[in-house]
Protein backbone atom coordinates (compact mmCIF):
# COMPACT_ATOMS: atom_id res chain seq x y z
CA UNK A 1 0.00 0.00 0.00
CA UNK A 2 1.30 3.52 -0.72
CA UNK A 3 2.77 5.58 2.09
CA UNK A 4 0.46 8.36 3.31
CA UNK A 5 2.86 11.18 4.20
CA UNK A 6 0.06 13.46 5.35
CA UNK A 7 -1.14 10.89 7.86
CA UNK A 8 2.36 10.36 9.22
CA UNK A 9 2.16 12.88 12.05
CA UNK A 10 4.85 11.37 14.21
CA UNK A 11 8.28 12.10 15.59
CA UNK A 12 11.49 10.20 14.84
CA UNK A 13 11.45 8.53 18.23
CA UNK A 14 7.75 7.67 17.98
CA UNK A 15 8.50 6.01 14.63
CA UNK A 16 11.25 3.99 16.32
CA UNK A 17 8.79 2.89 19.02
CA UNK A 18 6.30 1.87 16.32
CA UNK A 19 9.05 -0.23 14.70
CA UNK A 20 9.74 -1.89 18.07
CA UNK A 21 6.03 -2.73 18.40
CA UNK A 22 5.93 -4.11 14.90
CA UNK A 23 9.18 -6.12 14.90
CA UNK A 24 9.87 -6.83 18.59
CA UNK A 25 12.66 -5.78 20.93
CA UNK A 26 14.91 -8.71 20.03
CA UNK A 27 14.96 -8.05 16.28
CA UNK A 28 18.14 -6.49 14.90
CA UNK A 29 17.51 -2.81 14.16
CA UNK A 30 20.84 -2.07 12.50
CA UNK A 31 24.34 -3.35 11.97
CA UNK A 32 27.26 -0.99 11.51
CA UNK A 33 30.37 -1.39 9.32
CA UNK A 34 32.21 -2.99 12.26
CA UNK A 35 29.57 -5.76 12.15
CA UNK A 36 28.13 -4.73 15.49
CA UNK A 37 24.39 -5.49 15.43
CA UNK A 38 22.04 -3.74 17.82
CA UNK A 39 18.49 -4.87 18.58
CA UNK A 40 15.52 -2.53 18.68
CA UNK A 41 15.32 -3.03 22.45
CA UNK A 42 18.96 -2.11 23.02
CA UNK A 43 18.64 0.87 20.67
CA UNK A 44 15.70 2.22 22.70
CA UNK A 45 17.47 1.50 26.00
CA UNK A 46 20.69 3.17 24.82
CA UNK A 47 18.74 6.14 23.48
CA UNK A 48 17.07 6.69 26.86
CA UNK A 49 20.30 6.32 28.85
CA UNK A 50 22.40 8.56 26.57
CA UNK A 51 19.56 10.94 25.73
CA UNK A 52 18.87 11.68 29.39
CA UNK A 53 22.55 12.56 29.97
CA UNK A 54 22.67 14.78 26.87
CA UNK A 55 19.34 16.40 27.79
CA UNK A 56 20.88 17.51 31.09
CA UNK A 57 23.48 19.50 29.12
CA UNK A 58 21.17 20.97 26.45
CA UNK A 59 17.84 22.76 26.14
CA UNK A 60 14.55 21.36 24.83
CA UNK A 61 14.28 22.24 21.14
CA UNK A 62 18.02 22.96 20.89
CA UNK A 63 19.76 21.98 17.67
CA UNK A 64 22.71 19.75 18.63
CA UNK A 65 25.48 19.06 16.12
CA UNK A 66 26.49 15.42 15.61
CA UNK A 67 30.00 14.89 14.26
CA UNK A 68 30.06 11.11 14.31
CA UNK A 69 30.67 8.25 11.89
CA UNK A 70 27.77 6.17 10.57
CA UNK A 71 27.98 3.62 13.36
CA UNK A 72 25.79 2.41 16.23
CA UNK A 73 26.79 5.40 18.34
CA UNK A 74 25.37 7.81 15.76
CA UNK A 75 21.98 6.06 15.77
CA UNK A 76 21.82 5.83 19.57
CA UNK A 77 22.79 9.52 19.89
CA UNK A 78 20.33 10.67 17.23
CA UNK A 79 17.42 8.78 18.79
CA UNK A 80 18.53 9.78 22.30
CA UNK A 81 18.40 13.46 21.41
CA UNK A 82 15.06 12.96 19.65
CA UNK A 83 13.59 11.12 22.65
CA UNK A 84 14.20 14.18 24.81
CA UNK A 85 13.02 16.85 22.36
CA UNK A 86 16.41 17.92 21.01
CA UNK A 87 17.06 18.38 17.28
CA UNK A 88 20.06 16.44 15.93
CA UNK A 89 21.99 18.34 13.24
CA UNK A 90 24.07 15.91 11.18
CA UNK A 91 27.49 17.35 10.37
CA UNK A 92 29.32 15.82 7.41
CA UNK A 93 32.97 15.52 8.44
CA UNK A 94 34.03 15.30 4.77
CA UNK A 95 32.63 18.79 4.07
CA UNK A 96 35.80 20.53 5.27
CA UNK A 97 36.39 23.04 8.05
CA UNK A 98 35.01 26.06 6.19
CA UNK A 99 31.69 24.36 5.35
CA UNK A 100 31.38 22.82 8.81
CA UNK A 101 31.88 26.24 10.42
CA UNK A 102 29.24 27.68 8.09
CA UNK A 103 26.85 24.83 8.96
CA UNK A 104 27.34 25.50 12.68
CA UNK A 105 26.45 29.17 12.09
CA UNK A 106 23.45 28.45 9.85
CA UNK A 107 21.79 25.96 12.23
CA UNK A 108 22.81 27.66 14.69
CA UNK A 109 24.61 25.19 16.95
CA UNK A 110 25.91 25.86 20.46
CA UNK A 111 26.66 22.19 21.24
CA UNK A 112 28.46 19.50 19.23
CA UNK A 113 28.51 15.82 20.19
CA UNK A 114 31.42 13.77 18.88
CA UNK A 115 33.83 11.00 19.82
CA UNK A 116 37.53 11.26 20.66
CA UNK A 117 38.17 7.96 18.91
CA UNK A 118 36.48 9.24 15.74
CA UNK A 119 38.29 12.60 15.86
CA UNK A 120 41.61 10.76 16.28
CA UNK A 121 41.02 8.10 13.60
CA UNK A 122 39.65 10.56 11.03
CA UNK A 123 42.38 13.09 11.88
CA UNK A 124 39.84 15.82 12.63
CA UNK A 125 41.71 17.53 15.50
CA UNK A 126 41.99 20.84 13.63
CA UNK A 127 38.38 20.62 12.45
CA UNK A 128 36.92 20.09 15.93
CA UNK A 129 39.16 22.83 17.31
CA UNK A 130 37.89 25.25 14.65
CA UNK A 131 34.18 24.42 14.86
CA UNK A 132 34.30 23.99 18.64
CA UNK A 133 35.31 27.62 19.24
CA UNK A 134 32.50 29.28 21.17
CA UNK A 135 30.59 25.99 21.38
CA UNK A 136 30.38 23.22 23.94
CA UNK A 137 31.91 20.00 22.63
CA UNK A 138 30.62 16.83 24.31
CA UNK A 139 32.63 13.64 23.81
CA UNK A 140 30.67 10.39 24.02
CA UNK A 141 33.57 8.73 25.85
CA UNK A 142 33.23 11.31 28.65
CA UNK A 143 29.47 10.76 28.86
CA UNK A 144 30.02 6.98 29.05
CA UNK A 145 32.51 7.42 31.92
CA UNK A 146 29.95 9.50 33.83
CA UNK A 147 27.19 6.89 33.56
CA UNK A 148 26.16 5.53 36.93
CA UNK A 149 24.11 2.51 37.93
CA UNK A 150 21.27 4.97 38.61
CA UNK A 151 21.46 6.29 35.03
CA UNK A 152 21.28 2.75 33.67
CA UNK A 153 18.37 1.89 35.98
CA UNK A 154 16.43 5.01 34.95
CA UNK A 155 17.10 4.15 31.30
CA UNK A 156 15.84 0.60 31.83
CA UNK A 157 12.69 1.90 33.55
CA UNK A 158 12.11 4.38 30.72
CA UNK A 159 12.51 1.55 28.20
CA UNK A 160 9.69 -0.32 30.00
CA UNK A 161 7.26 2.55 29.31
CA UNK A 162 8.92 4.30 26.35
CA UNK A 163 5.82 6.01 25.00
CA UNK A 164 5.00 7.60 28.35
CA UNK A 165 8.55 8.88 28.89
CA UNK A 166 8.86 10.13 25.32
CA UNK A 167 5.54 12.02 25.47
CA UNK A 168 6.78 13.90 28.56
CA UNK A 169 9.87 15.20 26.75
CA UNK A 170 9.19 15.04 23.03
CA UNK A 171 8.80 17.80 20.52
CA UNK A 172 5.61 17.69 18.48
CA UNK A 173 5.33 16.24 14.99
CA UNK A 174 5.28 19.77 13.53
CA UNK A 175 8.57 20.72 15.20
CA UNK A 176 11.91 20.20 13.44
CA UNK A 177 13.03 16.56 13.74
CA UNK A 178 16.55 16.73 12.36
CA UNK A 179 18.74 19.22 10.50
CA UNK A 180 20.47 18.03 7.34
CA UNK A 181 22.89 20.23 5.44
CA UNK A 182 23.07 20.58 1.70
CA UNK A 183 25.42 22.76 -0.30
CA UNK A 184 23.73 25.95 -1.35
CA UNK A 185 23.91 27.64 -4.73
CA UNK A 186 26.80 29.82 -3.54
CA UNK A 187 28.54 26.77 -2.09
CA UNK A 188 27.63 27.58 1.54
CA UNK A 189 25.74 24.86 3.40
CA UNK A 190 22.02 25.31 3.90
CA UNK A 191 20.14 23.60 6.70
CA UNK A 192 16.99 21.74 5.68
What role is predicted for each listed range?
Residues 68-70, 115-117, 175:
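Helix N-cap/beta->alpha junction signal
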Residues 56, 83-155:
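Structural core segment of the AMP-binding/adenylate-forming
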Residues 19-20, 43, 47, 64, ...:
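Adenylate-forming
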Residues 28-79, 96-101, 152-161:
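Conserved AMP-binding/adenylate-forming core of the ANL superfamily
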Residues 15-39, 177-179:
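AMP-dependent adenylate-forming
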Residues 1-16, 27:
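Flexible, non-catalytic linker and terminal segments flanking ANL/adenylate-forming cores
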Residues 137-181, 188:
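Conserved pre-ATP/AMP-binding loop-to-beta segment of ANL
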